[in-house]
């Protein structure tokens, strides 16, 4: 195991391909100690609120996340200690009662729409990536994902996109692009960018 694990931040708009880029990196190092942690796992617990109140949550605002807890757990992993990561239930709009045990790794990919927005998170990262994808492509992907995986209606998705997702993208997410070491146009289909990133990771891991 490396003396100090490396942390890679991957961000971009909702439906922009962040997870696909992260998984492409994971798949490129099948024999390495590497894991992905999603900022979405750290949405705040809302079990004390009524369901009607929960569904009004602005999930694209920094205050929706318990980023303090994420930072605490990342520091634990950097220190070589395992953590129990929360699991979020999107259908109930609150945290599940179960957690996921994550052991320390050599490479930790931190993925989420706002992971470059918080300076404290940025300070933990060795490589910062911004996946830059066309707005139309992102909304189409979001519709497919939320309908298939999260049981939402088309009307609710479009309403949320126009009233919350798009404004929050321009207020918080897009401005964080300036902190990225590498901007990846079109996400995982940009093979050259993925190869450059993988080469950098491989050099750190001593696999080249």
UniProtKB/Swiss-Prot annotation:
Transcription regulation is among the record's keywords: no
Swiss-Prot/TrEMBL keywords: ATP-binding, Cytoplasm, Kinase, Nucleotide-binding, Transferase
InterPro entries xref list: P-loop_NTPase (IPR027417), PRK/URK (IPR006083), Uridine_kinase (IPR026008), Uridine_kinase-like (IPR000764)
Compartments, as annotated in UniProt: Cytoplasm
EC number: 2.7.1.48
Binding site for ATP: 12-19
Enzyme kind, highest EC tier: transferase
Catalysis performed (reactions): uridine + ATP = UMP + ADP + H(+); cytidine + ATP = CMP + ADP + H(+)
Membrane-spanning intervals of the chain: none
Main location: cytoplasm
GO cellular component, one term: cytoplasm
Any one GO molecular function term: uridine kinase activity
HAMAP family: Uridine_kinase
Family affiliation: Belongs to the uridine kinase family.
Name under which the protein is recorded: Uridine kinase
Gene name of the encoded protein: udk
């Amino acid at each position: 195991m490396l003396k100090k694990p490396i942390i890679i931040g991957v961000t971009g708009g909702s439906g922009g391909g962040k997870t696909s880029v992260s998984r492409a990196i994971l798949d490129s190092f099948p024999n390495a100690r590497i894991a992905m942690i999603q900022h979405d796992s750290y949405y705040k617990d809302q079990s004390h609120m009524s369901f009607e109140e929960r569904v009004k949550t602005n999930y694209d605002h920094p205050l929706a996340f318990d980023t303090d807890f994420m930072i605490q757990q990342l520091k634990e992993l950097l220190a070589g200690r395992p953590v129990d990561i929360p699991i979020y239930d999107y259908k109930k709009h609150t945290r599940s009662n179960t957690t996921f045990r994550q052991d320390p790794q050599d490479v930790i990919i931190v993925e989420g729409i706002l992971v470059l927005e918080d300076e404290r998170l940025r300070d933990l990262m060795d490589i910062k990536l911004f996946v830059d994808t066309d707005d139309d492509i992102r909304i189409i992907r979001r519709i497919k994902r939320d309908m298939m995986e999260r049981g939402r209606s088309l009307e609710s998705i479009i309403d949320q996109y126009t009233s919350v997702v798009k404004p929050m993208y321009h207020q918080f997410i897009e401005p964080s692009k300036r902190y990225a070491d590498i901007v990846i146009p079109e996400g995982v289909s940009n093979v050259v960018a993925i190869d450059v990133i993988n080469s950098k990771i491989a050099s750190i891991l001593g696999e080249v």
